[in-house]
């Protein structure tokens, strides 16, 4: 009889624990907040495929500095390119941006995405669209704030 009382008490405690744990709200991270940004870079294209220039940003980031870009044209048709842009803010750190571009439209256009960074920009994420008027990379999109 005593064994049944202990077993009943143990089952009751397990049930209380189960329902108590089940009612605790789960902790979930809030999704990152997209904040608009514009990145404008101006280059000297006379040294293709590796060009150098300057950049400025507005919106979610307000920085400026030196920029480099490696242009890798599609060897089959020359209409598409993959570019890697590196921004060197005057305050330190780097931001690396991958671009996928096409030259069939006027002005040429494409997409960009921040793929890495260092210093204050180590965990920076962002993406958007771009147009390429002469000598310029005009990127608009969002930076995701965590």
Residue locations for each model-derived region?
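Bacterial N-terminal signal peptides that target proteins for export
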Residues: 1-11
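Gram-negative bacterial Sec-dependent N-terminal signal peptides
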Residues: 10-18
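C-terminal segment of classical bacterial N-terminal signal peptides
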Residues: 17-26
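Serine/proline-rich low-complexity intrinsically disordered segments, especially terminal tails, linkers
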Residues: 10, 25-28
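Beta-strand-enriched cores of mature, soluble protein domains
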Residues: 30-146
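Residue-identity detector for glutamine
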Residues: 3, 25, 99-102
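Surface-exposed loop/turn and secondary-structure junction residues enriched for glycine/proline
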Residues: 4, 24, 124-127
């Amino acid at each position: 009889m005593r064994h049944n009382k202990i077993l009943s008490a143990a089952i009751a405690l397990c049930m209380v624990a189960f329902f108590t744990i089940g009612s605790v709200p789960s902790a979930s991270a809030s999704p990152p907040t997209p904040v608009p940004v514009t990145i404008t870079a101006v280059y000297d294209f006379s040294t293709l495929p590796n060009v150098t220039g300057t950049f400025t940003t507005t919106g979610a980031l307000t920085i400026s500095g030196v920029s480099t870009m490696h242009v890798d044209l599609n060897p089959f048709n020359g209409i598409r390119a993959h570019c890697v842009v590196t921004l060197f803010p005057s305050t330190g750190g780097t931001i690396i941006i991958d671009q996928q571009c096409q030259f069939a439209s006027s002005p040429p256009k494409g997409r960009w995405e921040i793929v890495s960074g260092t210093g204050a920009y180590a965990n920076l994420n962002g993406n958007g669209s771009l147009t390429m008027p002469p000598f310029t990379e005009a990127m608009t999109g969002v930076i995701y704030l965590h």
